[in-house]
Amino acid sequence: MTGPNDWNAGVVAEFRKNHGKVGGNFEGAPILLIHHNGAKSGKQRVSPVMYLKDGSRYLVFASKGGADTNPDWYHNLIANPDTEIEVGDETISVSASEVTGKERDRLYAKQASLFPQFAEYARKTKRKIPVVEFKPK
């Protein structure tokens, strides 16, 4: 595998083969797959990301490992918020929206307390890492 799309494809295949479980960097972490359409291209994509469950909401963090830009999936979800996620063996129709303000800060702090790499991602970048919630339809 040579690029991020190849890497994602490998993680997606492993996720589906193992009922939502993957190894490598994601081993033991809660992972979901985001289906998203390219904001410009319209091309359908699938991205594996760590999530936090909060009631009926699934929350994801557009950290991109602390890079100075948001991941493509974030821009795609803002442009096309009605989508699907895969959690384990289940595919769920959801609507995506950004969480802001104190609620965003609370949720990001919770994720960072569970997975300290998220605190490191926040230290590495000048941007405020977006938190996106998926609410089942």
Predicted regions and their residues:
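N-terminal short leaders/motifs
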Residues: M1-A9, H36-K40, D82-T91
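Short hydrophobic/aromatic beta-strand or adjacent loop that forms the aromatic wall/cage
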Residues: I31, K128-V131
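Short, structured beta-strand-loop surface elements
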Residues: S63-F118, K124-K128, P136-K137
